[in-house]
Amino acid sequence: MLAKRIIPCLDVRDGRVVKGINFEGLRDAGSILEQARFYNGELADELVFLDISASLESRKTTLGEVLKVSEEVFIPLTVGGGISSVERAHDAFMHGADKVSVNTAAIATPELISRIAEKFGSQAVVVAIDVKKVGNDYIVHTHSGKKPTQYEAMEWAHKVEKLGAGEILLTSMDRDGTKSGYDNVILKAISTSVNIPVIASGGAGNLEHLYQGFAEGHADAALAASIFHFRQYSIREAKTYLRERGIVVRL
């Protein structure tokens, strides 16, 4: 059985790590480099660097910061925000990214997923899917959650898999930053219907939530920010807790 992964996420804006609630009300969460160094030594399996305002402001990801982080960490680094072309993906890889995360640009041009996958391999392409519950449906949103799309979450998940995505980063906008637990309903629905790994995101508030994301949501990895950035828990604590409950993790 493949080990489940714990992935801290650096949401970056104006050169700092930030964290909000429901994609709003951003709070400073420290220095990018200090947080990256901390997680590199903390048993994190991977690290995600998301320039959360790049797509909203129609600009490139802050690649200078990406390069600095890549020189400090020796775990897989996923970079997202403003990856709107194969050229920008290439730039991210040249600055130390191991994977790129696409979201807004993939909705506008779904073929972008295929183009990046063909050039760099599916394993290097993560498609971030931000979902919000509207009535009984989970609707995909873009531009840092500001704009609803025509896609329902399950439909889009299947489409990106066919286009060559190697992984899905599924974020519940309703749960983001609330510390109320992952939305394991949509998480399970998508995780059990696609054949690529799904990363749970949005809502982790304690170690039991991580466990539930794996046990109930069938996630392959759990992404979290608030509980780790503000040192509520260490990743070592999280992995020990999970292992004691039968979840296979690397320690």
UniProtKB/Swiss-Prot annotation:
GO cellular component: cytoplasm
Gene3D superfamilies, per the entry: Aldolase class I
Subcellular location: Cytoplasm
UniProt entry keywords in alphabetical sequence: Amino-acid biosynthesis, Cytoplasm, Histidine biosynthesis, Lyase
Active-site residues from the entry: D11, D130
Keyword Membrane attributed: no
GO MF, one example: imidazoleglycerol-phosphate synthase activity
Annotated InterPro entries: Aldolase_TIM (IPR013785), His_biosynth (IPR006062), HisF (IPR004651), IGPS_HisA/HisF (IPR050064), RibuloseP-bd_barrel (IPR011060)
Keyword hit for GTP-binding: no
Cited function: IGPS catalyzes the conversion of PRFAR and glutamine to IGP, AICAR and glutamate. The HisF subunit catalyzes the cyclization activity that produces IGP and AICAR from PRFAR using the ammonia provided by the HisH subunit.
Subunit structure: Heterodimer of HisH and HisF.
Designated name of the protein: Imidazole glycerol phosphate synthase subunit HisF
